[in-house]
């Protein structure tokens, strides 16, 4: 019998737990430091599925759920609730979506949130 060799997988395969700080201009025209984390393929797939759902309520909350999954406080805890995310100004949502796209390398997503 051959012994199974333990393989070390590259960290680049996985979502990092790193908390990423970004200066983001919000609706008041001022820059604020916000924190984000990368999302997994599962969260990404849920977002895409929600965007194409036949259920209007699911589609309406797709971007809110993505923002909630990625935006955190400095300690990595969720920064806002789904209810708060639902109340984001459209321009702010688009800006946050662009930051989330950059962090996750979703080039095609920029400008779609």
Regions found by a protein language model. Give the residues of each.
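Short acidic-hydrophobic surface loop/beta-edge motif
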Residues: 18-29
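Short, surface-exposed, charged amphipathic helix/loop patches that serve as local interaction elements
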Residues: 30-113
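Extended acidic low-complexity intrinsically disordered regions
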Residues: 1-20
């Amino acid at each position: 019998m051959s012994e199974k060799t333990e393989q070390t997988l590259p960290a680049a395969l996985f979502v990092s737990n790193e908390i990423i700080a970004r200066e983001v201009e919000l609706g008041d025209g001022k820059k604020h430091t916000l924190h984000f984390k990368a999302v997994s393929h599962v969260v990404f797939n849920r977002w895409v599925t929600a965007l194409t759902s036949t259920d209007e309520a699911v589609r309406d909350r797709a971007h809110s759920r993505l923002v909630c999954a990625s935006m955190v406080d400095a300690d990595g805890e969720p920064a806002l609730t789904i209810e708060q995310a639902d109340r984001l100004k459209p321009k702010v949502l688009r800006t946050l979506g662009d930051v989330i796209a950059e962090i996750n390398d979703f080039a095609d997503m920029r400008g779609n949130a």
